[in-house]
Amino acid sequence: MGRIAGFCSYDPMKTKLAGAMNLFMSGSAFIYYGEEIGMPGSGNDPSKRAPFFWNDARDNGTTTPPPECALPEEYPFGSLETQMADDNSLWNYYRQAIAIRQALPTLSHGRTTAETALNAGCVSAFRKTWNDQSVIVLMNIDTVAASVDLSAYGDWTLAASLSADGNEIVLNDTTLELPAFGTAVLIPSV
C-alpha cells in the first residue's frame, strides 16, 4: 500500500483532507512514517522504506536507502525541517488533526452514522456518538467553498476546524462556511 500523498497526486489540499479523513475515523489511527510530511512511497517495497526526509541537506540522521529505492530529486512537500517552520504545512496540519482527535475522544471511539440531510453538493457529513456525546463532522471535498444550512439541527458550536488552504471556517448563526477541502467538527451548544 502506498502513502496517501501519492494517491492524492501530491496535491497539498487533497493530501491534507485525506489525512483528516484517516484521523477522524473510529478506532486506532495509523500513520505510516513519512505520511505526515507527504513522502512518496508506492510501487516496489524499497521505495516504501526510503529514508525519512529530516532536512533539505539530507545529511542529518538520514539512513542509506535500500537498493532499488527511488529517491526524488526534491521532496514533494519539503523536509520536516522546512515544514516545521511553515504554519500551513502538511506536518502542522497533521499535528492539528491529532490534537483535535485527542481533545474530542468521540472522534476515535464513536459510532459513525451518516448525516444525509447535511450532505449537499460535495460536502460529506457524519455524526459520531459515544457515551451520550455527539459530534458532527463536515468535510468539503470540493475545490470551491461551500455553505451548509444547519437550521434544522438546533444549536451547535464549532468545536474545531481544519483548513487545507488557510481560509477560515466560520459558523454564522446556522450557516457553516467551509472553504475548499475544509473540515469542521461541531458539538452541541451547552
Q: PLM features: residue spans?
A:
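Short, flexible beta-strand-to-coil junctions
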Residues: 129-131, 163, 189-190
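Solvent-exposed beta-strand/loop surfaces of large extracellular or lumenal domains
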Residues: 160-174
